Each structure stands twice: as C-alpha cells, then as structure tokens.
C-alpha cells in the first residue's frame, strides 16, 4: 500500500512539474512573439513608405 501511495505521489509531482514547465515556456514564447511584433512594426512602416506594397513589406520584415 505504501509503495502505491509513493508511486502515485511521485507521479503527481512529475505531472505538476511538467505543467509548470509548460506554462513558463508558453509565457516565454508569448514574450518572444510580442518582441518580434514590436520589431516588425517599424520595419513594416518604413518599407511601406518606400515601396507601398504591403505583401512585399510583410515578407521582407518577417525575415529579420
């Protein structure tokens, strides 16, 4: 009985660790996407002033 209880407790701890890691990683990815968008906005605006072609500017600025 103690062995089953210990195994269940360990399994719960592992699941909680995985969930915590996933949430931290998701926040990191969300932050990276926000930073990428902030960098793309000035690029896109400058490109539009020069070329006036939204599709070209979108492709050009996404490569940075």
From Swiss-Prot:
Q: Propeptide-annotated positions?
A: 27-38
Name where it mostly resides.
Answer: secreted
Q: Where in the cell is it found?
A: Secreted
Coiled coil (UniProt feature) = none
Tissue specificity remark: Expressed by the venom gland.
Question: What keywords sit in the KW lines?
Answer: Disulfide bond, Ion channel impairing toxin, Neurotoxin, Potassium channel impairing toxin, Secreted, Signal, Toxin, Voltage-gated potassium channel impairing toxin
GO terms, molecular function: potassium channel regulator activity; toxin activity
Q: Tell me if Hydrolase is a UniProt keyword of this record.
A: no
Where does the signal peptide begin and end?
1-26
Which pairs of positions does the record mark as disulfide bonds? 43-61, 47-57
Recorded GO cellular component terms are: extracellular region
Q: What is known of its domains?
A: Has the structural arrangement of two alpha-helices stabilized by disulfide bonds (CSalpha/alpha 2(S-S)).
Homology family = Belongs to the short scorpion toxin superfamily. Potassium channel inhibitor kappa-KTx family. Kappa-KTx 4 subfamily.
Chain's role = Potassium channel inhibitor (Kv).
Give the protein's recorded name: Potassium channel toxin kappa-KTx 4.1
